[in-house]
């Protein structure tokens, strides 16, 4: 399956009733600062360079970030942190990721998430993670030949990548690097959540 077909399938996904109801509710009720915006309020596809050597895996879209803008790590504090880091290392065209049509382009990098819908309290259930597993698994397979470095943001992303890749006995930690037998490098990091960045954890 090609990336464009996979992303179309993601957008149409209705496997998780709780998440479908939640993202629709958030899209209708909004928050005051975004009350005049039209929320995406659908599952969110991954994005970036289809021939990327750097694969970044996050947790899930944010309710008023990706769920609003239609692009993960866009329009929220986590997106600000990641966009700045990618720009400073030459992987992004600009240091900000505000909306789907802001001219922010990734170069040799691709960004995805374990769960494609924004979950309540940023915590997806085990069944929701399981339902989305097929999408991440396909993405990792599609990038098998080009990926050189994988960065997992948070333990959930780390655990799911290891499961898909058949990696055992690896332990999640912040700033931990694992050279893999296949030649790739796996880097685990805390997720750039507002709590982690504001408290200095990240």
Tell me what each language-model feature is.
Residues 2-198, 202:
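A polyanion-binding, active-site-adjacent surface
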């Amino acid at each position: 399956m090609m990336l464009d077909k996979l992303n179309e399938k993601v957008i149409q996904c209705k496997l998780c009733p709780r998440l479908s109801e939640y993202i629709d509710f958030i899209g209708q009720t909004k928050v005051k600062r975004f009350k005049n915006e039209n929320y995406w309020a659908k599952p969110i596809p991954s994005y970036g360079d289809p021939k990327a050597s750097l694969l970044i895996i996050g947790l899930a879209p944010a309710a008023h970030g990706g769920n609003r803008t239609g692009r993960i790590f866009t329009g929220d504090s986590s997106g600000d942190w990641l966009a700045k880091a990618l720009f400073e290392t030459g992987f992004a065209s600009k240091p900000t990721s505000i909306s789907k049509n802001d001219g922010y382009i990734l170069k040799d990098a691709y960004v995805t998430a374990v769960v494609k819908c924004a979950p309540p309290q940023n915590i997806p259930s085990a069944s929701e993670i399981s339902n989305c597993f097929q999408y991440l698994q396909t993405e990792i397979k599609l990038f098998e030949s080009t990926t050189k470095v994988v960065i997992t943001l948070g333990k959930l992303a780390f655990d799911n990548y290891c499961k898909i890749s058949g990696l055992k006995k690896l332990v999640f930690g912040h700033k931990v690097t694992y050279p893999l037998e296949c030649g790739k490098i796996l880097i685990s990091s805390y997720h750039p959540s507002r709590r982690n960045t504001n408290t200095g954890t990240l």
